[in-house]
Amino acid sequence: MSSAASNVAAAGSGVRGDSGPGRRPPASPGGPPRSPRVVRSASGAVSVAAALVIWLALLGPVITLLMHISPGAARTALTSPGALEPLVVSVESGAVTLAVLLVLGTPLAWLLARGRLPFPRVWEAGLLLVLLLPPLVIGLLLVFMVGPFTPVGHGLEALHLSASNTFLALVIAQVYESAPYYVLGAMAAIGSVDPRLEQQAALLGDRPRRVLRRVTLPLAGPGLAMALAVAWARAMGAFGAVIIVAYHPYGLPLQIWTTLQETGLDSALPFAVVLLVVALPLPLAAYVWSARAQRRRRG
């Protein structure tokens, strides 16, 4: 009996020893198991490589532009008579466009973000429709809406204005192409502000305008700046609607197009660089400000 009991105990201890913490797990049929750290490092390397490829592909046009531009051709193009007039036209029309968006787009974004308008989905659908319309289609629709042979066009003529091949037409085209970007971005920025903060300020006696000025706009400021910067870049590059309703006066996009058609690619590249220099600093500055504001909130 004692020998049988000892044999059973030895067998039991052997079974427990195979599955206990002191024993290694059996090897997988395909070989030794991979360490989770190795798997994570391999997947991380693949992710970084894929991200780098995508990043280089996105920046490829800009890098190619800088590599192919000739200093001599740039000097000749930018110093030719009237070469800087498109830059002035683009900056002036872009500034007016931003002013219109700030004055008209910000209240609309606030009303939509706070649900103060009836049928908010209809308003948002309208903004998305304008956002998704091809720019050339926007230009055609503007001709039928504010052209010289429309009721709006006749009303503008009575005021000695015109929405065809004028500075006003250029601003209208830029507003229509950039407004959805600003209003939708401003909606998201204002919607991220906690309404309870506005309610607390109102309970303390602040009027709605003061609440908007002292609470809502400062908290939504980075997001509003980012939306405005995107609208600026969109207005600076507006071409499809502009070429139909405002072929004159020339802005930078039309200058690039006409130079490309008349004298070739080498002469158009310097104006493309000027357009990038004018259009990109504001979005980059807004991005840096927004990132810093987010870090301050988290910290």
Give the role of each language-model region.
Residues 1-50, 117-120, 285-299:
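Transmembrane alpha-helical segments of polytopic membrane transport and secretion proteins
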Residues 38-72, 81-191, 215, 219-235, ...:
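Membrane-water interface segments at the C-terminal ends of transmembrane alpha-helices
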Residues 101, 204-206:
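A short glycine-centered flexible hinge/capping loop motif at secondary-structure junctions
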Residues 118, 207-208:
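Short coil/turn motifs that cap or connect alpha-helices
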Residues 193-197:
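Short glycine/proline-centered loop/turn elements that form peptide/ligand docking sites
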Residues 201:
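The alpha-helix within a helix-turn-helix
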Residues 247-261:
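Short hydrophobic, aromatic-rich alpha-helical segments embedded in or entering the lipid bilayer
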